[in-house]
Swiss-Prot record:
Protein name per its UniProtKB record: Autonomous glycyl radical cofactor
Job description of the protein: Acts as a radical domain for damaged PFL and possibly other radical proteins.
Keywords attached to this entry: Organic radical
PROSITE patterns to which the protein is assigned, alphabetical: GLY_RADICAL_1, GLY_RADICAL_2
Gene giving rise to this polypeptide: grcA
Glycine radical: residues carrying this PTM: G102
Molecular-function annotations in GO: formate C-acetyltransferase activity
Residue ranges annotated for the Glycine radical domain, each copy included: 5-127
Organism for this UniProt entry: Cronobacter sakazakii (strain ATCC BAA-894) (Enterobacter sakazakii)
InterPro entries membership: Auton_GlycylRad_Cofactor, Form_AcTrfase_GR_CS, Gly_radical, Glycyl_radical_cofactor_GrcA
Length: 127
C-alpha cells in the first residue's frame, strides 16, 4: 500500500517538511518534493531517510484506465431494401451516403463487391 507523508521531524534537516510516497511492501520511498539532498521522483530505501516522524497526507488515487485494442460502431439508419435498390438503380440514389469504417462515403462510389459486403455486414438475421 502506498502512503503519502510529510516529514515533520528528522535527524536530517533537509528532510524537514518534505513530501514522500511510502511503499511499505517494498520498503521504498519516492520523493515528491524536498528542500535539498533528494530530487523529485528519487526512489530510495526508507532506511536511507534515517529517523523521522511524519503526518499522513490524504491522497486521491484515480484508477488508471488502460485501453488496448478497441471497437467501433457504424450506424446506418436505412432499410436493406433501400441499399439493394441502390445497387440495381444507382441513378435513383445519387446522394445516398453511408458510414464505412468511420468514414462517410457515397454508396454508389463503392465497388459492387464492397456494396455487397456493406449490405451483408449491416443487415444480419441474428446477433
Amino acid at each position: 500500500m502506498i502512503t503519502g507523508i510529510q516529514i515533520t521531524k528528522a535527524a536530517n534537516d533537509s528532510l524537514l517538511n518534505s513530501f514522500w510516497l511510502l511503499d511499505n511492501e517494498k520498503g521504498e520511498a519516492r520523493c515528491v518534493c524536498a528542500k535539498a539532498g533528494f530530487n523529485e521522483d528519487d526512489i530510495v530505501p526508507v532506511s536511507q531517510l534515517g529517523q523521522f516522524e511524519y503526518r499522513e497526507i490524504p491522497m486521491e488515487i484515480k484508477p488508471e484506465v488502460r485501453v488496448e485494442g478497441g471497437q467501433h460502431l457504424n450506424v446506418n439508419v436505412l432499410r436493406r431494401e433501400t441499399l439493394e435498390d441502390a445497387v440495381k438503380h444507382p441513378e435513383k440514389y445519387p446522394q445516398l451516403t453511408i458510414r464505412v469504417s468511420g468514414y462517410a462515403v457515397r454508396f454508389n462510389s463503392l465497388t459492387p463487391e464492397q456494396q455487397r459486403d456493406v449490405i451483408a455486414r449491416t443487415f444480419t438475421e441474428s446477433l
